[in-house]
């Protein structure tokens, strides 16, 4: 019972929102997304609102939809809103607003303002607790971000099962991966439903965003796939049932999602789910249809592609190929659906969708009101979207639909025609014909019925016998059609065909009759009924035009083949029974058209009609029978028809047309060939036709042409024109003349009219345009003019397509027009092209000129216009005087002049573009005109101050093409006298255009090949220009230009100079100067290639030295130049490179001579603006030194020595010797000119660097025998330099080098030249370092000599320093082998060290050298340094430490090595012996000494410390006594107090290091000894000494307790009594005891702080220390002492309270402390201790610190404090009163309640 009640109470407590529980409320509102808990706890709602409102305002700027929330959840009033005080309705209303805001802000959560704004909802409205689901779902798309992790951390612990997936990640504080979320969506229906619900709600609110929708789509798609996969079962029924459950869950979501059309990503996500459903489950067709309708009904322009893909996948899963009507209509409404289907078919299966579209296209054929569906059907087959199998199925669907079309109603004639054409396409297409034939065979379709329904003939398909069912069906169809025909026949019985059916295009009566005729086709009975109609006047067929014209129009129109064949049959039947007294020549044009038809059946029937006409003419006895419909056939236009005499017609038919009847049937093109041959007066082979005479041909041609012109029907007209346009002329007339009226008529026809007449007869406007303009024959001399006259002058009424056709015809006939006519025609076109108004006429003329192949004469005529035009333009300018005085010499122009200038520019541009595009290389005769143009342009650009870059580029390009073609021939193809090289060079120099520059340079290069004598005198400015311009370019074309210029111009230039017997180097100096001057502007990656090409073309042997010298002279030691020079010499062989260097040195020598020669030309030596010869020489020599060092000469020489014969090797040695002599000669001659001398020395060094070490030493030995000491020193320095680098280490080199040592030792012992000795010692140093380890015995003697009087015993400072350093190197190399040389070395080196430290004679270099020597000894042979040596070193080191003339680094390094390497006992002993010397030397020496001790302790093992503890203790006690010693000296003290403090810090650090290496047993006696030393070790009368030792001791204890912490807390028992004593006498206000007091306070704080053993919790310890410690607060007598006491005593007291850790102890402390808070005597009458306000202030600070540190534990004593607080709140001192109020607020914050009631 009790436990149950307790549980209930705990639940109530957990859910309680007790308003009085301030602490709980503060915790509840301290959950934050952006602040940590500790910070959030301290913030009030005003602060939070201010921060969050700023973020909200920024959001409003981003999206105005946030603005309404400023009146609700972000209003000022919201700060006071508390959900716990709201009722259910208010909370529900708040939820609505909060969720609306969260939905809207979801897309901005990665922005800082949004996070701030949401934080307000969390802090004020606690949405993470009240709206948990909505909040989580808002943040869920960002599950990988730190923001989501922040949300997880503040979510309530009891998450609902919906989000149980988040629990483990909330606990472990890591972001959830994707997989668990998807798995939860798959298995947790509540989670998936929540995500779907949230996504749809946000989307309906139009607050959707990419992050949400991509997360939702991916999650839902994978979840559905997972659910379907997990539902798989071995039993199909079970699996189907589970799949249906999944589908039923998802369908409502899809339904809602697809309804939101404008949310594109949501809709596409639904498509993805539909695809998964279709792919992974077996859906019924009905459900798939529903999905397809939904998909098709949802797409927009943005989603249609995805929707189409989804539709194709869904269709693919259907068992029935048909698609729903709504889906079909949606596809049909798409813009270009076939193209879109084609785009997706490459990646997705579309076959079923395509079949569904085919089925939709042929559904309800009789009810289709337009041809849009049938157009789509045709496109599906034309684009080859269907595979072979699908194409067969589609054809079967079409054939079935057509076969049953008549059962549904009457098929319109247009639909019938369209389908007939499609079927014909099936039979004629190479790819579709086999499929169609197989489909016919497999589907058992009645071909005859199909042909009947479509009124067409299906060729090349075997006829199949219809099945019984088909026959029955046919009967049913027949009955339906008969009923239909009867009613239609009755409706047209009253129609009247007024005149010929050919008299007009639009005849309603004819349209009705032809529809009826189409229904009658196939039934003789119906046909009979139809032809008996009164409107046709069959009885008067030979005299009236109605009957025959009706059938003529029908068979020549765009109708089904069956209908046309039947029409021909009716004509044939009539002719077979007709009398021969009628002339039917009017039928001939239409029969010719029918004989050219693509259908063989039509051609066969037409041939029959032609044969019947031939029979009639044979039977005719009258010469001139009546011509049928002569005056009525075309209505009013009949009068213009040219008829043929009866006998002539008979001749024409019998001789020309009848012989080929069989061929017409077999070949549709045969009639065209026959007609062409007939009209040309020839006969086709094997045709049997005979040639007609000219009058007959003329009659026939004019007859046919007049019919073509006059007939109103465009279908036969177009076909007839195609036949006639094969014939240029006949019988003395041309088709241009005869068909001209039609061309005019067609030209004048308005666009909409032309479109209407062509659409009525299903012909293309473009086809008529093409045939109309083809009536103009190219054999007509005025063909171009005639064509042009049809569009010029231009009228806006002209149709653009007709204009285009005209110009296309011009292009087609241009090549056949005579050249002289081309010139005239081109002139006309050119004039029109330059008209101001931009019309299709102008554009067309320009296009013709650009498209046709213009002859040279035309182009030359155009070119000649340019100079003339420029001259004319200049004549319009102002007077010469005004022009000369105008600013910048510009031609002053009026607006009118500017317009003329613009016209001129356009004209010149057009001409030059025409020349450029007309393969100018094929017209070399243009060269003269182009050079004249170039001259005119060059003059003109100077007049108008314009670059004319484009025009110049075109001109130069054309010239370049001509010149390049001429280069390949033996002789120039044009007169070279017209070449103007000066103009080309001026183009290079005066233009800023890179294109012009490049073209001009290439032209110069080309001209230099075909006419060098005309070019070379102008070539130098070219290279000057190249240096300043072209060489700077970095594009590939410019690179090619430069290459060609160098390749072609330079060889010609060199050859020219040689022919003139001039020095080639001097002659090309300007060229070389141009290139070297351009170096810095040439792109870095191209420099080497360019200069290499230049040098190669000039000749490496002759020119390389000059190029190198000029580069070195101009750029000195520029790194890029040196790299280039190295690259240039690297490709040369060793002899060539050495020869180059020899010439280079000759040039240096020449530059230094009094009368410079070639150097004056190449380097400008001696010229007015030339550089100082000596500076030039220095630059050249330094560059040469660089080349010796960095080129591959050494490798090449070694290779040649190894592989080449004696001749090459001898050549190399000779050249090397010559170079050496040249260098030495320059050095000797310029010995007094230091820069040149040094530079020659550098060259010598680098030269020797090319030798192997053995060869080098051989050379040095020879040179050392010379008497020139300067040379000897120089070569030794070279040797040293060589050894400083990485010399050879092979065996031979090592032995040779060690064998060289005696030579050097001999120099040291015998030479009086100190500098030479110095160089020898330096060499010995290097040899010992590099090779000494190989054979130490060879080095020992050298070491003894260096240590002797002959070297470091000399008075010269330099030799001493070098010698000591050499000994250091030897010590390192030889190790113990060095011992024989040590006695002299140690004694002399210590003496030298002492000398280096003499006052006023300090020698830092010698000082450092000696310490380097001792460092080497300490490392390699430390046992050889005795105690006396160590004493000496230490004493001298103390002196060095205080000496200002030397550096500390080397000494410190040596002392550190002593501490590390020398025996530690010897080190400690030496320091102990010399401690007073260190102290006497001062703080720096003392610090260094302690540093040695510290390092020795650190680097040696524990055992060494324990073993030497006595001497170590001795050192430390001496060190600890430093403060007392300095105090005792009083004014004579050598250490400042700060120095003492610093050194004591070091001593404390050293002592701690020592303690770490000792155990307690070893250290405790030392500690007690130290305590005795500090407390009783000084006589009582020496108060100052005692204080000094105590200060030192307590400073140590401060570090001791602070560093070793709880390990040594127990040591406090040793000092507690002394501490109390110290606290009694030390005072922070007394300068003598202040340091002791501070050390004591800090020591106590460290001891209290690290007490883990309850040492200070013990009453015996606490009672002893508490009163003395708290009493220290009484030292706060003024502001300065109060600040010290508060800073030092209060922390110590606080730590003591923490360590005390019990209520009783706290009470005891508080009791003592409270006394200091009372300013007057208590009830007992005794002084309380708080009389001074500073004391009370300090006590208050202590209380504040204790309250902060201990919190509620300390405030358990609040009842005792309250009276004191009440008194203090009325204290006289303002500071005290202010602090007590702070304390009260602090108490209230901790307790969560106010103290007002308690204080009253």
Swiss-Prot record:
HEAT repeats lie at residues 426-467, 581-619, 1043-1081, 1250-1288, 1294-1333, 1755-1793. It is a multi-pass membrane protein. GO terms for biological process: maturation of SSU-rRNA from tricistronic rRNA transcript (SSU-rRNA, 5.8S rRNA, LSU-rRNA); positive regulation of transcription by RNA polymerase I. Involved in nucleolar processing of pre-18S ribosomal RNA. Involved in ribosome biosynthesis. One of its GO terms (molecular function) is snoRNA binding. Belongs to the HEATR1/UTP10 family. Component of the ribosomal small subunit (SSU) processome. It comes from the Eukaryota. This is U3 small nucleolar RNA-associated protein 10. It holds the Pfam family BP28CT. InterPro entries: ARM-like, ARM-type_fold, BP28_C_dom, HEAT_type_2, HEAT_Utp10/HEAT1, U3snoRNP10_N, UTP10. PROSITE patterns: HEAT_REPEAT (PS50077). It is found in: Nucleus, Nucleolus; Membrane. It comes from Aspergillus niger (strain ATCC MYA-4892 / CBS 513.88 / FGSC A1513). GO terms for cellular component: 90S preribosome; membrane; small-subunit processome; t-UTP complex. The chain crosses the membrane at residues 944-964, 1000-1020. Keywords: Membrane, Nucleus, Repeat, Ribonucleoprotein, Ribosome biogenesis, rRNA processing, Transmembrane, Transmembrane helix.
